[in-house]
Amino acid sequence: MTNIKVLDQDHGKMWYVYHGDCVDVARGIPESSVDFIIFSPPFESLYTYSNSDRDMGNCRSSLEFARHFRFLAKELYRILTPGRCMSVHCMDLPLSKQRDGVIGLRDFSGALVRIFERAGFVMHTPRVTIRKDPVTAMQRTKAIGLLWKQVKKDSCLSRMGVPDYLMTFRKPGTNPKPVHHTAEEFPVKQWQQWAECVWHDINPSNTLQKDSARDNEDERHIAPLQLQVIERAITMWTNPEDIVFTPFMGIGSEAYQAIKMGRRAIGIELKDSYYAQSVKNLRRAEDQQFSEQSLFA
């Protein structure tokens, strides 16, 4: 790493984390030095994570978010090893009459595809749909499109639940370290299940969650990516000891799972409480990893 401006940093044997702005920190990472990237970006202004001017979740419009996010996409392309992959977790975003003047959905996943393609990435997989229970979504959001009373009133405003997506992109070029699997560790039945474009078996509650990371009135939501999704992506597109990078680390879900699977991790987080909690989580993951290695040594 070249000299970078950070608020804080910490590390273990298998991980480095930086407390700061993801674009600033990413600029200090050497070119083609990361083997896999996985993250969940801020969903524009749908959720507010902090009151920082550098928080992309505080953008005033979709256009402003895209302008800021393009700087990061450029750095992600630069630091990723040729022939390697980047997985992005996202969802399409609700439009509200109060904020947007209409009720509907914004094609956020499509906007991300266009930003990453403009940066040089190739779309590697279709949008893998991760099913979410529409009843749970209705109870949490009270979205008019999911209410049964709206079906009775005027179902032209009724719609289906909004799923999560996992989209994977690839940096063109020859992969210098092919990712190999054996039939024993990756049986054909597992591949047939994972090759489906809709994943019905993801447990939405299997996340790295910690209430103590909530601290400010301006924060409304913690949305960690399901560990099961991270595990599948890391299994598919990395080798043991590869470097897994996440620019929006949150409380450390992607890095935590990477360490548990014998990979190295680099993460960046801007919010104070998330950063502090991620350090605790990564220390715990590393302790567990080395304890298991000692047990079977």
PLM regions and their residue ranges:
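Core catalytic lobe of class I
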Residues: 2-277
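Class I S-adenosyl-L-methionine-dependent methyltransferase module
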Residues: 111-112, 279-297
